[in-house]
Structures are given as structure tokens and as C-alpha cells.
């Protein structure tokens, strides 16, 4: 079968799984729900692999598959069509491959949950919309997938909606994403007005003939970037992502590794032709990316919830990716999307294994000494930690250092922020590992006796992801190490902008050495502090230094937003309700009712209830009409 015949099955199968599990959530057995939910994603992955290898052997690297003409009004023509090229083919493998491992993991992790069928139907729908997002051949189809993953994140973050805090976290994610989505939508409208189309195949060739610095292009790219900030959790719109930990742990893994948060990176990489012509926008992206990476890393330093540490690490790593996009390292950023998907899915699922073993305890202050109890979880998570810390030869080393090298070429200041962030990343990640797995168990002996390794359905995905986190960097080994940068050549076939490094090998080695040394120093400091020194984070109410307090309270960003946005809007809405709605609008409506009522009281006096009087008036009226007829007509 050809690519054109196969591609529509990739998103269709998860949608079928959503329908079957959604309709049969209360009637199908949990075993059957798990088989259907995981099976459709596995089938999509297998088809994606076939498409990927077919594309490799094809001289034509881009296939636009038309399904049907969806909207046609005047000059606006929007077909429902898919674009299969090197960029989307890699995303298909990430979404379906890691998505399948998360589904498999969930069959065990969520087995005792009453909403098992509903959970799998939501997961399938999430994957469907993400596939629609990356396959769309125009910005409208992409936007449908974009909004769909936002809806599914709301459903999954608030899956345990009976807990009011979890329900609030879901609403927060939904609302903050809508802010970014408005920017994306305005950017699409402006694009249609400027280019006369929303199709990639028509916009990008026109843009390629334009000179850099066009004001309209700058405005379009800024609006698109605002959309990416919301979906991919960048300053100032990142505070929803840590709260998304309210959902079940497999949801966290899916959102943070394989789907939602990578959408903004993908959209900018897909639109790299436009962003390359807007250097002002790129500069903003680089600054915000670097700032987000640093701020989130500082916040992660003092968190005690194992999932919150990983959540802020995701925000920080996304900041790295945006830094790369801003300095023109589109391939490096996408490379980091790929490696991050491996080690972040591994770390979240590993954290889920710990939480499962600890009977839903997430506070690292109550853990410790779990290495012997959870050997597979410990070993696999350690591989993921080494990868995210950027130590060679694990995957994160290659992708992170490619971004840092481009950052150095663009601005040594941004590179310096990146290196500081690398140091902090290694410190808080090894801090998490040491507090969780080394030292002595900080709970009771009775609790410790019930800690055990997770079942095979949960550990198998960990092992697979650990292998990928260890060797995944091989996909784009740089020339300085004798590699051929396969990924860069592959993405060039999708029109992703390429910017070569203009650095000597000695400079590249020095830059890599600096970041590696920073990570090793951070590792040793964390070991000295939390293993040799047996330090445990202080209780929530204990006094902290000013910087630690700032970090622990997340720079008070939620409180600031509450003060400058939420409270004024709340006060305005109360004023509007009490004055405009209650007194003015209700006054008009109620005043009309009162006037009608008072007028009816006077008219009511004519209704005496005397039948004789009614007959008299009827006769009088008839006589009057007859006289009028004879006299005047």
C-alpha cells in the first residue's frame, strides 16, 4: 500500500478506540478496554514505521494527501488534507511509539480505578488530536488538533474531578491555553489576509521570496509565538503546566513527553521559513526561552513533590528548545524534542512506579532508600537522569549541546544562561534521585515492608525508554565527533531552515566540556549534600532563606497573576453584576413590568363583573356602529 492509502489510518485508529471505549466504558471488561486502547495505538505506530521507511526510500519526500474539500467560501479554500514529510513522519513515531508505551503502562497503573474505560477513551482521543495537529497540511487543520489536545488535557488533568483542587487545575490549564490560542488564531487570520491562503504549500514559497524584517511577518510570527507560549508553557504562561500534575501520572507523561507541550515547538519548526525572516521575533523567542529555562530550573531546586520537580524540569527543557528556535537551531531544538520525549516519558513513568509502590505518596521527604526495593525503577530512572543532565554519551548530551553551541554563536550571554541552567538541571535531578532512592527510608517500618517493584506492564516501558534515552543521541551525532548529522539532513527535506555552526572544533569541544563539567560539579554537590550529608528538605512551614523562599513559592507568579489579573477582573465582574446588571438592566425589565402592572390596575376597573352592564355596553356598541354606518358611509 502507498503512503496515500496508509496515512489516514494513523489518526483513524485512535479515534475508533476512543469511540469503542467511550461507548463501552461501563460494559467492556478492563482487559478488553486495555487491549483496544493500547492496540489501536500500537497499530498506528506500526503503520507510522512503514510510512517512515517508505518515505526514506522515496525520491519525493513530501506527500500532500487530500481527503475532501472542507470549507470553500469566496477566496477561502480549506481542504482536510494531510502532509506527510520528514518532519511529520518523525512526530508520528514519537506520538504513537511513546503513546503506546504509556497506554501499556496505564493498563496496570490505572487498573483499580473506577473510570478505567473513560480514561482510555480520553487517552485515545488525545493521541488522535495530536496526530491531526502534526499531519495537517494547513494552519486550520493544525488548529483543530491544537484545540483538541487542549480539550483532552482539560479532561485528563481533571480526571479525578471530585477533588476540587484537581478540577481547578484542569480549568486553569484550559483558560491559560486559551490566552495563547487567541494569539495563534489571530496570527492565522493575519496570514490569510496577507498571503491569501492558510496552506503551507502556498504560504511558504511566497514567504521565501520576501526580504527579512517585513513588519507584517514580524507581527504574524509574534502572534504564532504567543500561541506556542501557551501550549508549550513559556513565560508568562507556564504556570498551568506544574498544576497539570493533578492528573494521573500516565497523563503527565503523555502531556510532557509525547503530545501537548511539544506542539508549540513543532508549529514553529514547521513555520521556520516565516520565523527565519523575522529576526526581531527570533530574538524575543531566544530571550524568553532562556529566561523560562532559568526560572523553572530555580523553582525546581526546592520542590519536594517528585512530580512537581519533573514538571518544572519540563518547563525548563522547553525553554532550552525555544532558546534553540530563537537562535536558529531548528534542528537542534527538534532533536531535543526527540531526546526529551525519551527521557521525560521515562522519568514520569518511573515516578509513577515510585508513587505506585509508595501507595500514592509523592513527597520525597517521606521516601529514601528505595533503590533495593525498586531496582528496575531505580536503574532506568538513573539513566533518564543522566540523559537530562547532559552527560555523555547519553542522548540529552548531544541535543542540549547542539542548542548551546548555536546559542554561543548567537550570544555568549544566552549561552551563559544555558550553562547555568545545565548546572541547576543536573543538581535538582540528582537531588530528586538521591532523596528518593538513596539513604535510609524515612517512613515507618510497616510502610517499608509493603514497598515492592511494579509489575511487568509498568517496568517494560521503563526499560524500553531507558534504552532509547541512552542511545537516542545517535540519530544526530555532530560532525565534531565524526557523525553525519542524519536528523539535520532528514529535516532539510521538510523545508526546516538549516543554520550551520561557524565554530572551530576546539571551540565546540570547549563548550561541551564546560557544560559537562558544570553537570558533574552539580552531581557531586548533590551527592555531598543529600547522600553524605543526609540532608532532607525542611518542612513546608519551616523558615527558609529569601532565595529558597522565592524558589519554593515559584517566584509568587500565581499570586502576582491573582493580584493584577484575577482580583481586578473579579472586582469588575462584581461591579458589573451589582450596578449594570442588577440595577440598570434589571431596572429596565422590572420597570416595564411595574408600569404594565400599574396600567392594568386602571383598566381592570372597567371589568365590573356585572353581566347586565356587559349586555348594555354590547348593545350600545352595536347601535353606535349602525348609526355611524348609516350617517357617514
Where does each model-flagged region fall?
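Transmembrane helix-loop-helix hairpins at membrane boundaries of multipass inner-membrane proteins
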Residues: 1-6, 23-121, 194-214, 218, ...
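N-terminal signal-anchor/start-transfer transmembrane helix
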Residues: 11-26, 100, 229
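Hydrophobic alpha-helical membrane-insertion segments
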Residues: 39-56, 180-190, 384-388, 461-480, ...
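Membrane-interfacial helical/loop segments at transmembrane boundaries in membrane proteins
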Residues: 61-76, 201-210, 399-406, 479-505
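Aromatic-capped, Gly/Pro-kinked transmembrane alpha-helices
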Residues: 75, 83, 478-514, 528-633
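Hydrophobic alpha-helical transmembrane segments
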Residues: 77-95, 214-228, 417-421, 499-522
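Hydrophobic transmembrane alpha-helices and their helix-loop junctions in integral membrane proteins
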Residues: 101-145, 151-450, 454-457, 468, ...
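Hydrophobic alpha-helical membrane-embedded segments
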Residues: 344, 423-432, 518-538
Amino acid at each position: 500500500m502507498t503512503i496515500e492509502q496508509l496515512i489516514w489510518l494513523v489518526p483513524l485508529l485512535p479515534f475508533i478506540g476512543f469511540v469503542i471505549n467511550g461507548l463501552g466504558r461501563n460494559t467492556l471488561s478492563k482487559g478488553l478496554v486495555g487491549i483496544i486502547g493500547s492496540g489501536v495505538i500500537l497499530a498506528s505506530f506500526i503503520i507510522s514505521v512503514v510510512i517512515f521507511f517508505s518515505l526514506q526510500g522515496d525520491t519525493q519526500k513530501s506527500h500532500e494527501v487530500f481527503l475532501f474539500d472542507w470549507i470553500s467560501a469566496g477566496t477561502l479554500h480549506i481542504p482536510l488534507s494531510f502532509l506527510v514529510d520528514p518532519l511529520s513522519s518523525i512526530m508520528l513515531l514519537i506520538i504513537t511509539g511513546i503513546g503506546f508505551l504509556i497506554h501499556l503502562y496505564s493498563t496496570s497503573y490505572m487498573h483499580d480505578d473506577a473510570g478505567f474505560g473513560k480514561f482510555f477513551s480520553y487517552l485515545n482521543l488525545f493521541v488522535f488530536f495530536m496526530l491531526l495537529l502534526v499531519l495537517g497540511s494547513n494552519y486550520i487543520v493544525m488548529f483543530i488538533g491544537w484545540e483538541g489536545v487542549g480539550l483532552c488535557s482539560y479532561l485528563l488533568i481533571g480526571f479525578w474531578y471530585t477533588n476540587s483542587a484537581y478540577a481547578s487545575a484542569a480549568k486553569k490549564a484550559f483558560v491559560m491555553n486559551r490566552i495563547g490560542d487567541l494569539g495563534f488564531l489571530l496570527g492565522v487570520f493575519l496570514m490569510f489576509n496577507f498571503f491569501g491562503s492558510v496552506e503551507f504549500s502556498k504560504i511558504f514559497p511566497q514567504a521565501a521570496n520576501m526580504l527579512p524584517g517585513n513588519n507584517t511577518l514580524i507581527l504574524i510570527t509574534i502572534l504564532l509565538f504567543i500561541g506556542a507560549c501557551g501550549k508549550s508553557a513559556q513565560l508568562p504562561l507556564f504556570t498551568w503546566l506544574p498544576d497539570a500534575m493533578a492528573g494521573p501520572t500516565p497523563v503527565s507523561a503523555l502531556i510532557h513527553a509525547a503530545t501537548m507541550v511539544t506542539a508549540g515547538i513543532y508549529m514553529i519548526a514547521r513555520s521556520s521559513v516565516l520565523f527565519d525572516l523575522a529576526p526581531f521575533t527570533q530574538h524575543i523567542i531566544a530571550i524568553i526561552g532562556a529566561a523560562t529555562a532559568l526560572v523553572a530550573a530555580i523553582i525546581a531546586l526546592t520542590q519536594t513533590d517528585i512530580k512537581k520537580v519533573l514538571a518544572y524540569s519540563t518547563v525548563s527543557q522547553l525553554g532550552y528548545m525555544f532558546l534553540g528556535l530563537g537562535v536558529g537551531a531548528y534542528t537542534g531544538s527538534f532533536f531535543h524534542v526527540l531526546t526529551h520525549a525519551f527521557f521525560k516519558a521515562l522519568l514520569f513513568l518511573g515516578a509513577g512506579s515510585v508513587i505506585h509502590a509508595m501507595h500514592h505518596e509523592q513527597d520525597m521527604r517521606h521516601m529514601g532508600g528505595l533503590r533495593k526495593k525498586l531496582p528496575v525503577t531505580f536503574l532506568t530512572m538513573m539513566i533518564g537522569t543522566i540523559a537530562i543532565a547532559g552527560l555523555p554519551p547519553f542522548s540529552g548530551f548531544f541535543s542540549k549541546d547542539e542548542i548551546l553551541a548555536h546559542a554561543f554563536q548567537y550570544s555568549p550571554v544566552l549561552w551563559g544562561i544555558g550553562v547555568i541552567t545545565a548546572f541547576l538541571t543536573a543538581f535538582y535531578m540528582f537531588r530528586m534521585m538521591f532523596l528518593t532512592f538513596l539513604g535510609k527510608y524515612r517512613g515507618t517500618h510497616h510502610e517499608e515492608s509493603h514497598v515492592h517493584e511494579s509489575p511487568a506492564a509498568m517496568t517494560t516501558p521503563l526499560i524500553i525508554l531507558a534504552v532509547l534515552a541512552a542511545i537516542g543521541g545517535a540519530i544526530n551525532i555532530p560532525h565534531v565527533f565524526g557523525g553525519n548529522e542524519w536528523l539535520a539532513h532528514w529535516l532539510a527535506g521538510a523545508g526546516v531552515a538549516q543554520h550551520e555552526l561557524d565554530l572551530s572544533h576546539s571551540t565546540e569541544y570547549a563548550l561541551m566540556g564546560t557544560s559537562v563539567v558544570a553537570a558533574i560539579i552539580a552531581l557531586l554537590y548533590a551527592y555531598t549534600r543529600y547522600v553524605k550529608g543526609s540532608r532532607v528538605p525542611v518542612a513546608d512551614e519551616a523558615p527558609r532563606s529569601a532565595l529558597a523562599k522565592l524558589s519554593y513559592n515559584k517566584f509568587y507568579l500565581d499570586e502576582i497573576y491573582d493580584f493584577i489579573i484575577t482580583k481586578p477582573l473579579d472586582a469588575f465582574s462584581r461591579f458589573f453584576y451589582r450596578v449594570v446588571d442588577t440595577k440598570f438592566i434589571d431596572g429596565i425589565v422590572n420597570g416595564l413590568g411595574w408600569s404594565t402592572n400599574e396600567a392594568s390596575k386602571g383598566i381592570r376597573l372597567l371589568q365590573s363583573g356585572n353581566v347586565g352592564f356587559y349586555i348594555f355596553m354590547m348593545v350600545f356598541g352595536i347601535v353606535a356602529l349602525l348609526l355611524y354606518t348609516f350617517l357617514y358611509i
